[in-house]
Amino acid sequence: MKKIINILTFIFIILLYHLTKNSNTFLLTFSFSLFLIYYSIFSSNKITKLLNDYYDKKYLYTMNKVFKCSILLIIILTMLLGVISYIISTLINIEKLYLVNITMTIFLSISLIIKLINNYLNIFEYKKNILLNIYKLSSILFNIINIFLLYKVFLSEDYLKIIIIYLVPIILGIILIILSYILVVKKNNKYTKKREETKINYIMQIKKSLIDNRCIIIYNIINASYIYISIIVLYYILLNRYKYSYDDVSNYITNTYFYGIIIIYIIHLIIKKIYNTDINKLKTSIINKDNNYKDLFHKKLNKIINTSLTITIILMIISGPINITLFNNDYNFIFGLVPLIFFYTIYDSIVNINIICNKEKNIIIFLLISLITKIIFEVPLINSAYRMGYTAYFGSIASTILGLIISIIIGIILLTRKLKINLLDNFNSILNIIYENIILCLILTLFTLIIKVDTKNIISSILVIIFYIFITIIYYIIKRIIIPKNNQ
């Protein structure tokens, strides 16, 4: 079911682009990037774990109280975030943004409550994730119909269209919350009325469960902040310094930091799925203090670097055809974002390993240093890119990459000190990976002289994508035959 939902979400994003191509959806980009920051605040799974613990102990009354207090906390916090959203909208001074942002915070509240109720139902062994799956599927399907009607049939103000896009999952969520309460939660309440003898401070327990996971929460907030900061800075520089029109700035930022970033993030998730098992094995090895964890660290790091670098190179070559295939757009806004895949993948891996073996304070400090680095260099790099004749977002991406590099360097230093690993032991292997990928890059670049990548129609773009992926596969098959496995 999860795969079906992911595929439908991807289809929805592509349809959204094509149906709104001639409209201004900048308010959706702005509000959704803020939504990602807010959602990160609630990214801890500790409350669900707390509910499970009480259920295992047969503390059903306490579990029920924690569940209700958690819902109340979500409502209070999202109301507070709604106020913050209003203040942000006033400061940014974009017309009707405050209405969109407030609607977005209501959507956030409903989504979080649905997720919590879903986890609550899972504890009582109802069909796993049934509520969440119904909510996601219905929201996607109804919104596909909704955006078609909004942008092709009923013509209205741009901000109203964005509000209605958020209202669809809000209304569906409210209906599902009411139904789940009537059919399930209310029924379970009769089993949870008997108070346990042990008195528990529910609010403190919930607070503790959130604080225990603060490193991951801060990590997620900082990741989302990279995008939001880029959007705000680009908006002000292009509009005020370089005198772009509002519509041009809106389309420019939406293409880059909404559709482009979504595609890059999907690719990152695919790469992460390739090496996720390896990272988990490494984490287990470090926690158990196995003798071979140093060799395992080098091996897994090599795999991550090799996989991410190869995919980055191939995507740099075929980003144009991918852009034509998905968006049928002559302006290739994916190309400049591709380097993020390599740096973000390594950054994500290094941070995740640090989380299990280093002090929380140290991790938070180096994450903040990377974000501050991005903020400091954002404006100078955007201006430099513009003056050199490149698109302005190249400078914005460069500042993000610089921040990620700082994080990677500090993170590796912390790991080498904590785990007593000498990176020089692995230096030759990393050099070999770089050489192999340089050769791949040269081969693919030479092929571009024969098979052009600047195609203008979808069918030829798909054929070009298949061809270059095939060449990459052939390259690695030949490499495996020529180079013995133990020397790779």
Please provide the spans of the model-predicted regions.
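Transmembrane helical elements of multi-pass membrane transporters/channels
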Residues: 1-17, 21, 172, 184, ...
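Membrane-interface junctions at transmembrane-helix termini in multi-pass inner-membrane proteins
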Residues: 110-135, 339-367, 390
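Membrane-interface helix-loop junctions in multi-pass transport and translocation proteins
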Residues: 130, 140-179, 183, 361, ...
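Specific pore-lining/lateral-gate transmembrane helices of multi-pass inner-membrane transport
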Residues: 53-70, 256-342, 346, 357
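Short membrane-interface helical motifs at transmembrane helix boundaries
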Residues: 79-98, 312-329, 380-386, 450
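Transmembrane alpha-helical segments of multi-pass transport proteins
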Residues: 221-225, 232, 428-485
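Alpha-helical transmembrane segments of multi-pass membrane proteins
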Residues: 94-118, 257, 329-350
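Interhelical loop/hinge segments that connect adjacent transmembrane helices in multipass membrane
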Residues: 159, 181-223, 417-434
